[in-house]
């Protein structure tokens, strides 16, 4: 369990660091979220039983807390970047709440999908859409239109 979870952290950390390296647009964030969901899917055995693992394994507990904190901080950074560019209009408090909600949905979407359809394949695109739709009310102009376009093209295909 420890070695597998270490692999999960090693694969997640660089991904969570990447978005802050340059200004992000709607398509960049969509791609970032898709890659994040693919990583979560790869390590789904941890995510599906995370509550049980947290109570039984102190190493998993501390590492998962760091991963969650990093996810949330990355979401804050991305939203602040969008706000600085005028793409997103939100207060600091709204950005923090949005980042928390985005992190919650991204972290637990596949468990939700599994509970809805235990024998079906997860719909990663729909999960990405759910996370992005949280930001939709705050997006302005072209970013909002692009989100609607991506959502229509991607979610309706899957």
Predicted stretch roles:
Residues 15-20, 47-54, 82-86, 109, ...:
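Secondary-structure edge/capping motif, primarily at the C-terminal ends of alpha-helices
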Residues 59-85, 96-111, 126-137:
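Amphipathic alpha-helical packing segments from all-alpha helical-bundle domains
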Residues 22-25, 29, 60, 91-95, ...:
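Residue-level recognition of alpha-helical structural elements
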Residues 1-17, 30-34:
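An amphipathic alpha-helix adjacent to DNA-recognition modules
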Residues 27-51, 66-77:
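Helical hydrophobic small-molecule/effector-binding pocket
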Residues 43, 56-57:
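Short loop-to-helix capping motifs
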Residues 48-50, 62-63, 91, 147:
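Short, hydrophobic secondary-structure boundary micro-motifs
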Residues 111, 115-158:
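C-terminal peripheral helix-coil segments that are non-catalytic and often amphipathic
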């Amino acid at each position: 369990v420890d070695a597998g979870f270490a692999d999960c952290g090693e694969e997640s950390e660089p991904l969570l660091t990447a978005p802050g390296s340059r200004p992000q647009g709607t398509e960049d964030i969509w791609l970032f979220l898709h890659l994040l969901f693919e990583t979560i899917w790869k390590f789904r055995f941890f995510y599906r039983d995370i509550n049980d693992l947290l109570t039984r394994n102190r190493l998993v507990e501390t590492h998962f807390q760091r991963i969650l904190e990093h996810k949330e901080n990355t979401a804050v950074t991305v939203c602040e970047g969008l706000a600085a560019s005028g793409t997103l209009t939100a207060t600091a408090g709204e950005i923090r709440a949005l980042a928390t909600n985005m992190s919650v949905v991204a972290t637990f979407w596949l468990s939700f999908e599994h509970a809805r359809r235990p024998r079906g394949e997860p719909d990663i695109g729909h999960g990405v859409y759910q996370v992005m739709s949280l930001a939709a009310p705050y997006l302005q102009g072209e970013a909002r239109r692009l989100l609607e376009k991506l959502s229509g093209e991607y979610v309706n295909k899957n």
